[in-house]
Amino acid sequence: MTATGAPDVGDVADQDAAAQAAVLRGLPSQAQLWHWIERLNGFGPRLTGSPAHAAAIDFLAAELQALGLQVQRDHLPLRRWTAHATHLALDDGSAIAVAAPLPYSGVTPADGLAGELVWFDGRPRSFRKARGKIAVVALRRRDLDRTLLTLAFKRKARLPDGDADVASPITTPLLTGLQAVALDKARRHGVRAVICVFEGVSEAQLHGQVLPFITPYRDLPAVWVSARHAEALRAAAAQRRQARLTLHATLQDTTTDTLYAVLPGRVQDETLIVNTHTDGPNACEENGAAGVLALAHAFAALPRAARRRTLVFVLVTGHFQLPQIGVHGRQATSAWLQQHPQLWDGRGSHARAVAGITIEHLGCTEWRDDLAAGAPAPTGKLERDLVYTATPALDALYRQACAGRSKLRALTLSPRLEVAMLGEGQPLYQAGIPVVATCPIPDYLCQVLPEGGIARLDPAYAQQQVETFARLLARLDQRDAAQIGRIPLTPGRLLSRLIERLR
């Protein structure tokens, strides 16, 4: 203790070391973490509200209950769209391979629907010329380049070196896939169906992409096809020929569950939130729940007296159907925050969340699309971990928690606009909760893959990521709220709030 009464730097370091050691003793092994990841992946694609997703949620609930935690469920209504089969052919019978349907687009009659093809170069301002016809829209891949990254984010630490930064564009189907085509506009203009031709992406990379996942049901069938079919479709449209599209899908009213569990600490008026989502198409998207289980194990192993604050573990549903689950289309955790203010907003007798940790997409290795080869291939690198650190103190604490790692490739950043923040850490940030959120974006993030693409994950990398968050959470529990800090009120945050009020 210093003469002013503040903790001595050496005392803080000793307390951190002791707290971290205690937590790491209770942290499950790499083998156990990998077992959980394999179990989740073993359910198959866990798209929102599907039987596989429900089974995975039940499994996670049982694992938390086995720790002695009381698991609560929020039952959320969902109108679930499920695609069963697709087929596309020109009027001469030549088949056009469908890479994937656009989620929640629409459904055709059993024998499909036929219409004249109308070609559009890029996203059209108007679909009027395709009224009563099938629109074919060519979309060029948009990458996350350094300019876009600078406009959207403030880049901070590069760990362990400059290779974690973005020297060349991050090639990804995600940005173009999320934007896709304005199906609502096309439907208003009387379009019968839409074919999206994705340029700059190999057919193997495009196959099974679940994009976009941020749009509601549009009642307009739409599919992705690869660029190898572009010339055939363009030529057919120029000759005013027809095609027949079949998209067999069902709509079902059901429910889907968010889980949360509270682990009490010495004080009840301050909480730390650890969250992720449970729905996704493959082994990496979403395996964050395995990391949440690991942290729950580590902290539940401590005596209550060793936990300063109450921990709240939140596993939300709805990330892959944000229009139905998220509040005003925000990320799915926004629904949980809205329903449980007593655990975070600090008003009246409510507890205040002094910090949050969001874990997503553990253990990803880097694969990049090779158009010449016609398929993506591994680069031999770890996937760049994009880690949002909401305050300077959190950035420093995260960097300290990474010390000693042999598998590390992380770029820390903060969003200039709240909407630019990817992943389920966004609602915490929007609510003013200081958060550290990991959200790497591998090319295969939203892709249904054979065996879930689990071979693309590195178990040791996943374990070291979780160990980092265990150290970080232990340090956060030792810090006063003032030491963690508040999210700076930047011009970008003010603009985000103004936009939100105008919605």
What role is predicted for each listed range?
Residues 9-51, 67, 74-76, 201, ...:
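N-terminal capping segment at the start of a domain
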